[in-house]
Amino acid sequence: MASLKDLRDRIASVKATQKITKAMQMVAAARLHRVQEAAQSARPYAQRMAAILANVATDVDTIDVPPLMRGTGRNDVHLLVVCTAERGLCGAFNMQIARRARQQIKALLSAGKIVKILTVGKKGADILSRDYKALMIDHIDLRSVKRVGFAEAAIISQKIIDLFDKDTFDVCTLFYSEFVSVINQRPVAFGLIPMGSPKGAVEAEDVTQKVDENKNLQSIVYDYEPDVASLLEELVPRNLSVQIFQALLENVAGEMGAKVTAMDNASRNAGEMINKLTVAYNRQRQAQITTELIEIIAGAEAL
């Protein structure tokens, strides 16, 4: 049985931990409002750009479609871009994204495909490297970035374009977590390359409906200057950056939401533990007082 001093030390330790978790919860909650607003505000732009691009692609000959849109024409080598958080303490947020990526990896390997992995975020790299280190070809570290912006998305998209130009892969799929609410983040897979169809070209079943929500744009007739091929050459790489930027924003919002929930649960658990330890401390203290009183009374009677 723990002594009174041990119980006091444990209570003090748990209280100190509770202060930390409450502080982290407050910080995450303060950031959540800003990043949630950013993610939700950027969605219409990303959705409409993808829809317009898909519509424009129908007005150009196949031979004039940029390679990033039409792909290589093969389906043999798959590049999986897995975006997770750089830090932990956010519940199962990172594990859910990694689990979705694992499912896709297993399905592709079972189908005889070649899989290559590009990770964005330390936690995803740590998780996937346990089983698929040999498949990981590169990693993008964003730990030094205080606030994710379009510049980081452009770096990632340029890395993907460089790999594509080197004929490193045929199909590219982006994995991230779509922010639904503070307590709900949905891991999804989105087809980046080829991007000739609204849903991209992935074998995943839960591809986000970024374009399906804008089907009304497909009936619009466009005029192009100088010509549609030149327009696509400019729009396609930018659309790649835009979709990645949206994924990064969704990820940050999801991470903060998961962190708020995780720290709230941790604070509640700490409170319950403090109550249990306090009860144990009071019982042991009362038992010790009772024992001392009995010894005093017994000594007095002996005299």
Swiss-Prot record:
The keyword Ion transport applies. The keyword Iron does not apply. CDD domains: F1-ATPase_gamma (cd12151). One of its GO terms (cellular component) is plasma membrane. InterPro entries: ATP_synth_F1_ATPase_gsu, ATP_synth_F1_gsu, ATP_synth_F1_gsu_CS. GO terms for biological process: proton motive force-driven plasma membrane ATP synthesis. It is a peripheral membrane protein. It holds the Pfam family ATP-synt. It is found in: Cell inner membrane. Keywords: ATP synthesis, Cell inner membrane, Cell membrane, CF(1), Hydrogen ion transport, Ion transport, Membrane, Transport. Gene3D superfamilies: 3.40.1380.10, ATP synthase, gamma subunit, helix hairpin domain. It comes from the Bacteria. Disulfide bonds: none annotated. Coiled coil: none annotated. One of its GO terms (molecular function) is proton-transporting ATP synthase activity, rotational mechanism. Its main location: membrane. F-type ATPases have 2 components, CF(1) - the catalytic core - and CF(0) - the membrane proton channel. CF(1) has five subunits: alpha(3), beta(3), gamma(1), delta(1), epsilon(1). CF(0) has three main subunits: a, b and c. Belongs to the ATPase gamma chain family. Produces ATP from ADP in the presence of a proton gradient across the membrane. The gamma chain is believed to be important in regulating ATPase activity and the flow of protons through the CF(0) complex. This is ATP synthase gamma chain.
